[in-house]
Design a protein with these regions (language model features):
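Short amphipathic, positively biased membrane-proximal segments
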Residues: 1-356
Length: 356
């Protein structure tokens, strides 16, 4: 049964990825959008401008999806087909690879056609920057950076957590990532309340972002990129970004495309100056299609790793954990039996001594 469930988990991840690639995000009744509305309602009820309230909000908003995933896992522990179907549905729900590549392609088409106003209107689908004063190179840079970071957030990380932790991992990761987008940014309202959500998202993306960087280096030639240059830029610049994770993805993408990312980012009401990543010219419209191609190749590579995990490493880890638990239980039983026997012998000795 354990082997069948492992195969079902892997098959569900592959099927969910295929659904996302073919259909993209659901146009109506998207579960993630529904979660966002529920989380927004919860925030309005529990909000206080302190970290304790934010931690409680994060624990509840992430804990419920994790418990739902755990209940579904228990309910399908002897039903491989049911597990595969639920895993496929959850994977499709939490992935955003097709939508990400589509937005990059649309932005590239608008910029190549000289329609900067249309590109500015479209930028909100990718990031939260203020597009009103951005020219073509800055719009292209914002798009490349968003594609790089969201390849990790919307593709690699969900697949990785789905492989390692199954349904609870898929749902819990997407919940945490959604909360980070809602309350994890720097603003007067969320400076303290959003700390827990931001830190949790950083923690959950530590490994996926680095894997995304490595995979971006590996697949750079699929978009006529230089693997050696991508490797050098990634090693040199990945830790210069203020985010512990975004720089991993953006530095690798900058090296793969041969462009320079970073600079001044303007948001609504504030601006940030980021270190430069890469050595080339500023991105142009022609780079967006290549960035989308790299994102797709990284997603396929991550899928291969994720699908292999449940039937290889995960299976071995499960067997090892089961062996440890069985040995621990056997040792505990032996110790308990020995203690009981000694106790019984001591009591018998006391009764015998009293009789004499």
């Amino acid at each position: 049964v354990r082997q069948s469930i492992a195969v079902a988990n892997a098959a569900g991840l592959v099927a969910g990825y295929a659904l996302d690639s073919l259909l993209g995000d659901p146009r109506r009744w998207h579960p993630v959008a529904g979660f966002g509305r529920a989380a927004g309602a919860l925030e309005r009820r529990v909000y206080r401008p302190d970290r304790a309230a934010g931690a409680a909000f994060t624990a509840l908003a992430v804990g419920v999806p994790v418990l739902v995933g755990a209940a579904a896992t228990v309910g399908t522990r002897h039903r491989p087909l049911g597990r595969a179907v639920l895993t496929a549905a959850a994977t499709w729900t939490v992935l955003g690879g097709r939508t990400l590549r589509h937005e990059a392609t649309v932005m590239g088409r608008a910029l190549r056609g000289g329609d900067v106003p249309a590109a500015r209107r479209r930028l909100g689908h990718l990031c939260g920057r203020d597009p009103s004063a951005l020219d073509e190179p800055e719009l292209a840079r914002a798009t490349v950076e968003s594609v790089a970071e969201n390849t990790s957030d919307a593709v690699v990380a969900p697949l990785l957590w789905g492989a390692v932790a199954g349904l609870p991992g898929l749902l819990g990761y997407r919940a945490a990532n959604t909360l980070d987008a809602m309350v994890g940014h720097r603003s007067p309202r969320y400076a303290r309340f959003g700390t827990a959500s931001a830190r949790l998202d950083d923690l959950l993306n530590l490994v996926p972002s680095r894997l995304t960087g490595l995979l971006t280096v590996a697949v750079a030639p699929t978009a006529h990129g230089d693997r050696g240059r991508a490797w050098r830029v990634w090693l040199r610049d990945r830790d210069d970004h203020p985010s512990p994770n975004a720089g991993q993805c953006e530095a690798a993408m900058a090296g793969a495309l041969g462009v320079r990312l970073g600079g001044r980012n303007v948001y609504f009401g504030r601006s940030e100056v980021r270190p430069y990543l890469g050595d080339g010219p500023r991105p142009e419209a022609r780079h967006l299609k290549r960035a989308a191609r790299i994102s797709g190749a990284v997603g396929l590579a991550a899928l291969g790793l994720a699908a292999a995990y449940p039937v290889t490493v995960g299976r071995l880890a499960g067997a090892a954990a089961g062996s440890v638990l069985r040995r621990t239980a056997a040792a505990g039983t032996a110790v308990a039996g020995s203690v009981l026997r000694r106790t019984a012998a001591a009591r018998a000795g006391r009764r015998g001594g009293g009789g004499r």
